[in-house]
Structures are given as C-alpha cells and as structure tokens.
C-alpha cells in the first residue's frame, strides 16, 4: 500500500479497531499501532495521517511523536482531550456528560457535506484553547466539543463515529481523503491479486506446510496459498480431540473432497488428553494445548523436510491481541520462512476474501471457535466423559438455535459444562449430575458484544432436550452477563 494509509493509534479501549474497520469499509487502508510507539517508528511507517483514539479512563499521556511527524492528526474521544492539553490548553471542567445534544459544524474540510445533527456525548470538557486552535463545532448549549489548529492540521473531536452513524462516516472519509490525501483503493479483490503475486515471489519454486483448523481464517488462507502455488502447499490438520461434534470428519471431508487440497491429518486426541490430565486452571490449559500442538507441527515438519515454508492463518485481531507482530510457528522453521498471508485482514474481510476464493457457504458462515477448543468450555479437569456430555449438549443447543432462525442474529452460541454437580431426578431416582450453561452473543467489535435475547420457549425446548437426551446433565442455565463485566468465553 506504500504510504497511502491512515495509522490508527490506540490509547486504550475498543475504539481503535472499530474506527479502523470503519475506514477500511470506506476503502481506506488502515493499520493499528499501540500506545508507546516512538517517533522513529512513526517515520518508518510514514502514514498520510494519524487517527488517535481511546484513552478514556486511561492515564497514558498523548504521544508527542504523533504531533512531531508533520502529518494531519485527528484525535477522538479521550484522545482529543489529551491532545489539546498536550498543546497547552487549560481545562475548565466537564460541561456535558452522557447526554445527547444538537451539534452544529462550522466551515472546515473535516465537516464538508455536514451542517447539524443530534449526537450522543459521553463527555465534553471545556478548554481555554491555546494559540492556533479554534472551535470548529458547537452544541445547542454553546459548548465546543471539537477544535482544530487548521494550519498544523490537528483536529480534536470529543466524540466518536458511532454504529450506523452516517455523519461519523463522512467525517472519517473527509479526514482520509480531503485532509490526508488518501485514495479509497482498499478492496479484498485488490488484496487477493497483490498477495498472490507476493506469495509467488516469496516462495518461488519452494513448497509449504500450513496448519488448518477448518475455521474460516485457516481455510481462506489455505485457498489463497493454493491459488498462489497450487499443489506445493500441503495442509496439516491436527485433530486435538477437543472439537465439536462431527467437526473433525467435516474438516477432512471438506479439504480433501470439496476443496481438493492436499491434507495431512494427525489424530492427537489421546495425546492431548494425557497432557491435560489434572490440569484445571484456564491459563495452564491453554499453555499445555499450545505446547503440544506446536510439538506435533514440528514433528510433521521434520517428516517433510522438502517443505521450506510454514504458513499460518493469523488475522489482524490475533496480531493485535498479542500486542506483537511475532506469530507462533513450528520450531523447525526459521522465522524468515514463515508466511502469514492474511495477517492484516479483519475477520469480516477474511470472509469476503474467502467468498472470492470459493470458500463453501457453510464454512463462510461458521462461527468463531477458540483455538484450545472445548477445553475452555469444559470447567475443571478435561476428561473424555465430560467432553462427550459437552458435545451432545452443544449440538442440541446449536440445532435449536438454527431451527428457531436465531443463528442469523448471533455470531457465537455454544454450551459450557460447569464443574458443579447438582441434585436432580432421572427416571424417579435422585441424581447428582453436571450443570450446563448456554451462551449466545452478537459481537460488535474486538471487545464488545450484546447478549442474545433468545425466545423463552426456544430456551425451554433446548433445556428440556439437553436434560432428557444427555444423561449426566440435570440442570441448564442461560448466561446473560454483559460485556462490561465479562468476556464471551468463560476461560
């Protein structure tokens, strides 16, 4: 993309991903950088402009390196307050908090095509503006939620472009194109053509192994590699024994049959369960599974010395969650021989790319599944008997969701097996069996989701079926914990 892009600087919070995706949806390429970056890194990246977001509730100062680069800067939310204070403004306290007000935009290239609208403000502070800055918008009460140094092209808005917000989309587009001079050229089709060329140049006449799970990310990446180098890529599927009901067979059938890709399948169920014996803590579970998985990939790599490259289906959210550009890879492979073709794509972009590559519709709609699999949905020690209960309960819940047509409203829905045993009754006999928890969410971003408001009669049917058809579970609950306090997964 050369330097025709906007750098999104994350000061903390979920907004960086949301704003970056909004710009990409308008075909402007973006990259995200975490707070703490130095001026030299900014200069190496050489973006056309910098969007600084987040910082609400965080104590980190505004990065002066962003101001020193000499390119346009747009700061949103808490970052706007940090920027103006860094430039010498004096705070006059909070003027508005958690309320809506009408906003009028003054003549400014950032607000071309806009005049006034109603907007929700989480917080608006008053400032005695420093030299060079002027107010560029006012609320109905006469407050200034936006200001700018037009000569230095520094803009601060104490609000965000919210969901389904046409004015916010216009502001971001104006910043990218009219102020920064970016061109809206980012599309999945252009990415596909460019990445195929890059892979062919990088791999040359070599061959590659690629770890696949059957999910959207790794399958799309495998199809991309196959488009680039054909039969010289071999997929490696490790059946950890921690997949949902019927998934291992589905993965093998899809890759070898429907997609016609070369596949090495490794049955590692017993091996993984042996390593997990006695492990209860979630962090330790993840570490054990990761270590064993990487050992298996390294073994496959040693058995295929002709494969010079190792490929992973890492996507952008994986990269951001790690806080590093270094991805995991099989230890036999030198880092210079590692490929992550879709590492700069968000999940929705991966799905679009998959469709271009012929990804089966059923796979394109497949919900996200954690890397450690059912181990993180099985509370306490993971055993084969507990996994069997969880698989059956999960399959019933997913079937009821789909029969009720609720799957189109949700991004993830699954069962969790609690380690608690409760008193119940089965065939007139008192029992002590496991409790099962159902979870359904609609994700809106990297750290934001809504709890699925499922019809009560559907939940009743699912609960009744699970208790009746899965001996070993005698109690079913539905988790409605909000994202402000919990994660989607329990572990």
Predicted features, each with a name:
Residues 1-52, 56-62, 67-69, 85-308, ...:
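RNA-binding accessory domains that recognize and position tRNA/RNA substrates
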Residues 75, 79, 84:
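Gly/Ala-rich beta-loop-alpha elbow adjacent to hydrolase catalytic centers
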Residues 312-314:
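Extended catalytic-interface subdomain
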Residues 316-318, 444:
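Short loop/turn segments at secondary-structure transitions that flank enzyme active sites
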Residues 322-323:
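Short, solvent-exposed loop/turn and secondary-structure capping segments
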């Amino acid at each position: 993309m050369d330097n025709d892009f906007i750098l999104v600087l994350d000061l903390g919070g979920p907004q960086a991903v949301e704003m970056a995706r909004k710009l990409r949806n308008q075909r402007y390429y973006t990259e995200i950088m975490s707070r703490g970056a130095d001026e030299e890194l900014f200069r190496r990246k050489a973006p056309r402009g910098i969007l600084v977001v987040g910082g609400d509730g965080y104590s980190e100062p505004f990065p002066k390196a962003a101001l020193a680069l000499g390119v346009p800067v747009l700061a949103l939310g808490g970052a706007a307050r940090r920027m103006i204070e860094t430039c010498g403004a004096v705070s006059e306290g909070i003027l508005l908090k958690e309320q809506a007000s009408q906003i009028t935009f003054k003549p400014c290239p950032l607000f071309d095509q806009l005049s006034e609208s109603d907007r929700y403000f989480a917080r608006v502070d008053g400032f005695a503006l420093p030299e060079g800055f002027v107010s560029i918008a006012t609320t109905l009460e006469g407050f200034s939620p936006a200001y700018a140094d037009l000569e230095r092209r520094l803009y601060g808005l104490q609000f965000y472009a919210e969901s389904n917000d046409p004015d916010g989309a216009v502001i971001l587009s104006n910043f990218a194109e009219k102020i920064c001079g970016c061109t809206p050229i980012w599309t999945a089709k252009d990415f596909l053509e460019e990445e195929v060329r890059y892979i062919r140049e990088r791999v040359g006449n070599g061959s590659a192994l690629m770890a696949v799970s059957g999910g959207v990310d790794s399958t799309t990446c495998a199809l991309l590699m196959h488009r680039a180098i054909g039969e010289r890529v071999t997929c490696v599927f490790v059946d950890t024994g921690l997949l949902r009901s019927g998934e291992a067979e589905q993965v093998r059938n899809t890759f070898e049959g429907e997609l016609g890709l070369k596949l090495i399948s490794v049955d590692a169920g017993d091996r993984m369960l042996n390593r997990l014996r006695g492990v209860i803590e979630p962090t330790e579970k993840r570490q054990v599974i990761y270590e064993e998985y990487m050992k298996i990939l390294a073994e496959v790599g040693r058995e295929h010395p002709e494969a010079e490259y190792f490929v992973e289906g890492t996507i952008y959210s994986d990269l951001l969650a790690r806080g590093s550009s270094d991805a995991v890879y099989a230890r036999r492979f030198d880092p210079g021989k590692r490929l992550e073709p879709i590492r700069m794509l968000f999940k929705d972009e991966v799905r679009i790319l998959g469709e271009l590559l012929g990804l089966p519709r059923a796979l394109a709609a497949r919900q996200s599944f954690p890397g450690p699999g059912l181990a993180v949905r099985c509370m306490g020690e993971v055993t084969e008997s507990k996994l069997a209960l969880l698989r059956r309960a999960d399959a019933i819940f997913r079937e009821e969701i789909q029969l009720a047509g609720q799957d189109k409203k949700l991004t993830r829905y699954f069962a969790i097996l609690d380690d608690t045993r409760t008193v119940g009754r089965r065939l007139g006999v008192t029992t002590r069996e496991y409790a099962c928890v159902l979870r359904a969410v609609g994700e809106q971003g990297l750290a934001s989701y809504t709890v699925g408001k499922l019809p009560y009669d559907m939940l009743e049917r699912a609960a009744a079926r699970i208790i009746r058809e899965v001996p070993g579970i005698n109690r079913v609950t539905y988790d409605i914990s909000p994202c402000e306090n919990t994660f989607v997964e329990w572990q």
